[in-house]
Amino acid sequence: MTKHILIISSELFSLINFRSSLIKYLIDCGHRVTALVPKEEYNNEDSIQKLKSMGVIFKSYSLSRAGLNPFKDYLSYKSICFVISQCKPDIVIAYTAKPVIYAGMAMKHFPKISFFPLITGLGYGFTEGDGVKRKLIRQLMIILYRKGLKSSESIIFQNPDDKKLFYKLKIILRNMSSHIVHGSGVDLDLYPFSPLPKKPIFLMLARLLIDKGVREYAEAARIVKAQFPKVIFQLAGRLDSNPSTISSNELNFWINEGFIQYLGEISSVQKSLTSCRFYVLPSYREGTPRSVLEAMATGRPVITTDTPGCRETVID
């Protein structure tokens, strides 16, 4: 039976790079797919056209992705409610914290619609740290997740640690349906195996957040290059509005000191992976790190951390 499926995203980049295979599958099965993206990204015509060519319908909504302004978050909630009332989908899929929480809260007004939240990682509030701000955000997120997940038909996790933590914090109850999917998957046609290059190039690809282990990577680069100056440490990704972001001054210091080669925000992940010999992700916590899966598909040795999400990618 054909369904109308609404997918709520916090950014267009992840919708195209992480969900396009799922969207294509749903459309190939005969379902109608509407994608909801933040208003500020709605003008990215090239990216939107890629999904429109597959048959995706686009809508926009108000979202402050990393902000803590309650008025803006209330606008996100009302905006999602409005789109759902207009689209009248049969199924709503939301991923990342704010879309999951506010879509979940909206679902109490639409009891006949099935809601499937995807927990792709827990972010700043749930990583280790003793700061007052982090603790307050964590407590707020616990309360909001409890409210947002009440209306879910089934909750989809990407690793068992996140699921256990949600049980421990009583965010979800044992009788609530849930599944673990171990990541978003990688299209092996887009990330084929390639021979290792001869140059000793290490690559880290991530948003430039402290919680991603960017500082640890830079410090490791400094230590190694002091003894082996021909080794290259590349860093790719953007500065972010997240509370855990590093400063541009810190990034420029690493670049000027010569131990980090900064690639900026790259358009071709596959090309950068093909050029490196080792892939590194020293993250504090992930859902299931897509970049690690892509690196493995390409045939790159991976150095990552024994932390939730990351540990699932490695058989030790």
PLM regions: where:
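Short hydrophobic beta-strand element within catalytic cores of glycosyltransferases
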Residues: 301-304, 314
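Glycosyltransferase donor-sugar binding loop
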Residues: 36-43, 205, 232-246, 262
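Aromatic "clamp/platform" in nucleotide-sugar-dependent glycosyltransferases that forms part
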Residues: 265, 284
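N-terminal strand-loop element at the rim of the active site
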Residues: 8-72, 165, 177, 238-241
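Donor nucleotide-sugar binding/catalytic pocket of nucleotide-sugar-dependent glycosyltransferases
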Residues: 59, 142-192
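Short His-centered aromatic/hydrophobic patch
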Residues: 94-100, 119
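Nucleotide-sugar donor phosphate/pyrophosphate-binding loop at the beta->alpha transition
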Residues: 18, 71-78, 114-116, 124-151, ...
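A conserved mid-protein helix/loop that constitutes part of the nucleotide-sugar donor-binding site
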Residues: 16-21, 204, 209-223, 293
